[in-house]
A protein has these predicted regions:
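Glycine/charge-rich catalytic "coupling/switch" loops of P-loop NTPases
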Residues: 2-17, 21, 34-35, 42-95, ...
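Short, acidic/hydrophobic/Gly-rich beta-strand patch recurrent on exposed beta strands
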Residues: 24-31, 38-39, 96-102, 109-110
Length: 140
């Protein structure tokens, strides 16, 4: 199955913390890099057979990746991925920003042109990609 989701990263399940409705899954990326945290339904965990040590693909829509120009503290967002901007494609309303992180991987973020200009995001800039755990999907 082909997907339109730009951010697709392979890893192994490091931990599964079950809840009544939602389950928190920590994914360790193949080849190293930061762990990703996903909050998915308990039903999805059962249906996909997600277990510690099992292979999964982390899926994140580019529109769900926010950017910060400095480390962020005092925030509930679990996935804070430091990286370096490798490319910026700016349009009239939105911009696509590619961020290199951990072992040659990239995340793609789509932000408003206004945010791009306010933050001064440009190629070579250090940024932190921010993704809520509830915005991370998993595939097996």
């Amino acid at each position: 199955m082909a997907l339109s989701i730009r951010n697709q990263i392979d890893g192994k399940v490091a931990s599964v913390v079950p809840g009544e409705v939602m389950t928190v899954v920590t994914v360790r990326l193949d080849g190293g890099g930061p762990d990703f945290t996903a909050a998915v339904t308990a039903e999805a965990v059962r249906e996909l057979g997600i277990i510690p040590g099992g292979g999964v693909t982390v899926l994140i829509k580019a529109t769900e990746v926010a950017l910060a120009t400095a480390p962020v503290r005092g925030i509930s967002i679990r996935n804070r991925i430091p990286g370096t901007v490798t490319a910026v494609t700016a349009g009239g309303a939105v911009a696509t920003v590619r961020v290199a992180f951990g072992g040659g991987r990239e995340l793609t973020s789509v932000i408003t042109r206004e945010a791009l200009d306010e933050l001064g995001v440009a190629e070579g800039a250090d940024v932190v990609a921010l993704v809520k755990a509830t915005d991370v999907s998993l595939a097996t």
